Amino acid sequence: MNVIWSSHVQGIRTLYDSRKLRFDDRFAEQYKALFQLDGNVSLKLLEIGCGPGALAEVLHHWYPKTRITALDRDSAFVQFAKSKEHGVTFLEGDATALPFGNNSFDVTVSNTVSEHVEPSKFFGEQLRVLKPGGVCLVLSSRKGIHIPAKCLADSEYEQAFWEKVARFDDSMEKYGVCKYPMSEAQLPEAMERYGFHDVQTGYVTVDLTPDDPKVSPHMALTMIEAQRSNDLDALASVKNTIPEQGTDAELAQMRRLINAKYDLRLAQYARGEKQWDTSVSVIMAVRGKK
């Protein structure tokens, strides 16, 4: 059972909640314009590195006629995804050795996976399993904007804790996180180099601002709670990865401080006290054909 990523890098709630926001229906038309998929045709689509299944779930909603298979090497992600979405086939597997025959799929898609996998294997396996004329879609996060609410600033205790953790945390190197980063120019170049043609690029802007009047109260609260999940998952990762750097008492105090901050932010929202905190993600979409 492989649970390295969910235990040491990004927790289930962090990935699922943040991706559900990133692929919310408010941004659907931006994505669809770049994907250029025919929703009236019964396509076979493979998502590589699906995590806890948020993107596969959304794709099933956007393209109900498409038969979707989603694969990840983390057992906990796959188990969670299966419990959330029954219209998708979720499997454990390796992006560098896809368990499918040649020419099996019409579309492959991945989200924030390319930077973690050796490029010749990442693109080579997709080229192999795609049918002639099949489409490869690679989504990659680019530099965005993150302005937190003032009440979410770290206290001196939190700052000291995270500084201590940073001195000893080698999980990025140990687990090959972002081992193969590529710039906005290098990513489409790599897709061409490994056999794809008609390569195109585009960008989706995901604006998450809870106090924006256009944002529903439900969505605003979801945005705030997703940030809370991210911080709590980061704390859990410390316990899993370098437990000697966080005593039970320290971790309990950190949880109290984190929850108190987010409870205050929720109270501010409920009272109509606008903070104008925002998170703007820029998602690069690269599309190529076999």
Across the structure, where does each feature detected by a protein language model lie?
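N-terminal, positively charged/glycine-rich alpha-helical extensions of SAM-dependent methyltransferases
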Residues: M1-T14
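Conserved alpha-helix/loop element of class I SAM-dependent methyltransferases that forms part
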Residues: L21-V41
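Class I SAM-dependent methyltransferase SAM/SAH-binding core
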Residues: L46, P52-A97
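A short acidic, Gly/Pro-enriched loop at the edge of an enzyme's catalytic core
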Residues: T96-V107
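A short SAM/SAH-binding and catalytic strip from SAM-dependent methyltransferases
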Residues: V107-S120
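A short glycine-rich, Lys/Arg-flanked "PGG" loop and its adjoining helix->strand segment in the class I
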Residues: K121-V135
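Conserved catalytic/acceptor-binding region of the Class I
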Residues: V138-S229
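Conserved Class I S-adenosyl-L-methionine
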Residues: Y180-P181, Q200-K289
